[in-house]
Amino acid sequence: MKVTLIAILTCAAVLVLHTTAAEELEAESQLMKVGMPDTELAAVDEERLFECSVSCEIEKEGNKDCKKKKCKGGWKCKFNMCVKV
């Protein structure tokens, strides 16, 4: 009985340590990614998606063909949205 309890507690401790180490490693890998946008840039990216799709929706309502809006800074309009080139 004691051996089983010790084995269960040991497995639980190993699982906790492994999970903690995996979370730390994942956090480090996220921080190490080159070119990963921060929260401010992510908000700008969402605004670009919205701006391009709204622009095309307005043009369609006016019985005009949807002209591609020029997205700047490495972005282009595709399927009514700005996408990263």
Swiss-Prot record:
Propeptide: 23-48
Tagged with keyword Heme: no
Subcellular location: Secreted
Keyword annotations of the record: Disulfide bond, Neurotoxin, Postsynaptic neurotoxin, Secreted, Signal, Toxin
Name the record gives this protein: U4-theraphotoxin-Hhn1a
InterPro entries cross-referenced by the UniProt entry: Hwtx-2-like
Chief location bin: secreted
Intrachain disulfide bonds: C52-C66, C56-C77, C71-C82
